[in-house]
Amino acid sequence: MMFKVKVYKRSSFIDKRGYYWTSWKKGLIKNLEFKHDKFSLSKKNVLRGLHGDKKTWKLISCPYGKFFLVVVNCIKNSKDYLKWKSYVLSHKNGLQVLVPPNYANGHYCLSNECLFYYKLAYKGKYADVDQQFSLRWDDPKLNIEWPLQKSKKIDKAKLSYIYPKPILSKRDR
């Protein structure tokens, strides 16, 4: 796969008191000027995305909790068009994922709560919701293997675990 997504490990210090980490240091990524940051707090089983736009770079990290991140290549002429990769980000592993323009991303909260933090770099004005594209989280063409939490209930007719539906926004349904 020719994904342009890059993974970084931020410096951090963890001990019995908690943790301390650096989210960004100038010069880490050349030729990108981050213009603003966003946070999203989610509860367990919340699934957000998949969204993207044509001009924004996103540096994604998890300062609290743990989430499953999916990144999808949406470049139509690419041999990896609609191919996806996944990453588990947490405050303990310190991973950061740089998502380029024309890629969609979405995440699923694995812990009781998780904080999705991202820095945005783009030219011109910010591409707000009306300039973004969305993909269905459960699109069969993508066949994303979301780690939906298994319920302890068993569907005896199907002899399989029942997966609770993820909690979605109106935009993501």
Q: What residue ranges belong to the model's regions?
A:
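Non-catalytic, conserved peripheral segments adjacent to functional cores
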Residues: 1-92, 113, 120-173
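Surface-exposed loop/turn positions
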Residues: 93-95, 103, 114
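Short beta-strand His + acidic residue motifs that chelate non-heme Fe in jelly-roll/DSBH
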Residues: 97, 105-110
